[in-house]
Amino acid sequence: MKTKIKATVALLGATMIASSFVNAATPSTIITIVKLSGIAWFDRMEQGVKRYAKDTGAAASQVGAAKGDVQLQIQLIEDTIAKKPTAIAVVPLSPEAVEPVLKKAAAAGVVVVTHEASSIQNASYDIEAFKNADYGVHLMDSLAKCMGEEGQYATFVGSLTSKTHNEWVDAAVARQKEKYPKMEMVGSKNESTDNEAVAHDKALEVLRTYPKLKGFQGSSSLDVPGIGRAIEERSLQGKICVFGTGLPSNTKQYLDSGAINQISFWDPADAGYAMNKVAQMVIDGKKIATGDDLGIPGYNKVTLDGKVIYGQAWVDVTKENAAKYPF
């Protein structure tokens, strides 16, 4: 009898050990869910996700809705939860709107990490390339220098519910009021819906409404190319300053023509890689602390504020150095 018991215990132990080896060998499934698919910004982010998969062996992939619609993104997150991934990395159109579905993901045992959502509650961590207020101040200082610190300017956001875009603009306007009193923001924030054609049309409308306008600040990666096209059509290169977030791949022609003065950005590929790496760290039970090096450019000495991880990852690009960034 004792022999049988010992044999049974040994068999159970062997089974548990074998099971642990299988679990350890099973790669994590991490699905990155972006605001929308098919635009340069998130195409570049997908390169980072694929690089993470190649480097680590994780089953890492990226999905996005065909257009920037909050309800479509929520449904996509719902569909993704049903696939039972190990983790999801979400770049939300509206952090507030996705809170309930992210809560559902966490309740289902799915690790949640976000980007561009510093107010998020239902995630283990949110990853930001930099402190949004610092970036907004930087954009305003650049715009003000170009405008000679005086005159009217207009601001654009991809969405009025995009926390990141609004934080940039709010910080920029606060900086203007504090340091550049001869400058004036005209109208309210213009919403491009992350659509270059909409940004173009609204820029033309702003130019008609405010003929003395001297500057634009864009937030979505599709704002400045849309604005730049409007500037070219009106032959206003060199007369109106255009600054904002963008990528060389869809702004270089306007940088070269002078329709856009400068773009600033962080590499979305590195952000995508960072989200996936942090998700795996959470899966492994690891904690992030201020001063940690994630081993990713711009995230070599992060700052942790609550659950928000901040890097120092922005770069400025003009026509002089655009060729250095082939994406």
Which residue ranges define each predicted feature?
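Gram-negative bacterial Sec-dependent N-terminal signal peptides
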Residues: 1-23
